Amino acid sequence: MQELANKVEFGYADIDEAFPPCDPGIHPFGSRVLVQIRTPKNKTKGGIILTTETRETDAWNTQIAKVVAVGELAFKNRTTMEPWPEGSWCEPGEFVRVPKYGGDRWTVKTASGEDEALLVIFNDLDLVGKVTGDPLTIKAFI
């Protein structure tokens, strides 16, 4: 079964389809980072229409996200409030890998009004890493 799942391709047309523009309606406080989780496709590259349950499972298991906003104290020493020696781990517009569980999650309508975007606020130390490759090709493993 896992072998079949690894062969399914979703074929996003572009980055805006995977991370559609939306207004999160919030800016993170302190050392928190606001990210938008990659939006699941309605159908596969081969034309198979995905059920709502499949799309929801994909959305809640995807760990690739676009950084939307960074709190004023993110990536700073908690005692001195000075920036970390290595600097910020990520900036708005960059892509990161986030934990599957945790964070404060909610959805908002996208700018088109057709889909919902899943947004999550994490503590800066909870981010797993920066995506250096194509964020559209990284698959969710369920």
Predicted regions and their residues:
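Compact, glycine-rich, soluble single-domain proteins
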Residues: Q2-I142
